[in-house]
Amino acid sequence: MKIHDCCSTADGLVVGVQRHEAVSQHCAQRAVEAVSGVLGRYRFGGSLRLRLQRIMFADDGIVAQLNYRSPRVTVRIQVPIVAEDGIEAIADRLDCHIRRQLTGRPLRSWPDPQRPVVGFVSECRPITRRKRFHLMVLEPHIAAAVMDTFDFDAHLFIDAETGQDAVVYWAGPLGVRLARQSKMAPLSTAGMMTVNPIPTLCLSEQAAIQRVCMYGLPFLFFTDVRDGRGRLLYRRYAGDLGLVQGRATAPGR
C-alpha cells in the first residue's frame, strides 16, 4: 500500500512524498527535513517529489528516489539506505548533484560507494515496469552527462554517430562505457569512455529475462528479435524487472 503526503516549507518549496506502508511516517519526515535543509541553503524554491519504498531483498532496506525541479537546476537521485540510519545519504547525494550542476564539474566517480550494483541470481522474475520513450539522438558523451544528471545506472538513447540504439553505463576503466548494437565505429570523442567491442546480443524478451536472472546481471542491453530495436532490461530494487524501449523508429536504418 502506498501513502501520499504533501507539504510546503517556509522558503516556498513544495514537497510531495510517496511512501510504502512499511516505511514509517517518522522516517519520511526525517528525509524531508534533511533534503529541505540542503535546498534551503540554495534558496531555489521549486518542487520536490520523494518516494520511499522497501527493498525486498535486503533486511531494513529502503530505496529513496528524489525528483527536484527549480528554475536553476533539475535533479533526480536514487539511493538505497539501511533503515533510518542512512537518511543523511539522501541529502548528501542531492547536495553533490546540485553542486556539480552549478559548477560544471565532471561526471561522478565510479565505482560509486552509495550505489552498489543491483544484481543477483534469482528465478525468472516478471517485468513490472515498462517505459516507452521517444529516444533522444545524442552524442555518446552527452548521453553520459544525461545519465549522470538523472542518476541512472545505464541510459538508452540513439547514437548520433551511428544512428543505432545504444546505451552508456558505469564501468571501468574510465568510469563510463558505451555499447552499440552492431556498428563498432571509433568514438569521435576519444578518451571520454571505452566502447564495448562485442556486438549486442539479439534476443527475445523472455531470453533476456532468463539471462539477467540466471547470471545475476544488474541490466542487459539487447536487440529485440521482433523489431531490431535496442532494449534496456534492468533489475529493480523491488526485485522484479523493468524494461526501457524507444517509441519512434531510429534514424539511419
Regions found by a protein language model. Give the residues of each.
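N-terminal, polar/charged subdomain of small-to-medium soluble alpha/beta proteins
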Residues: 1-253
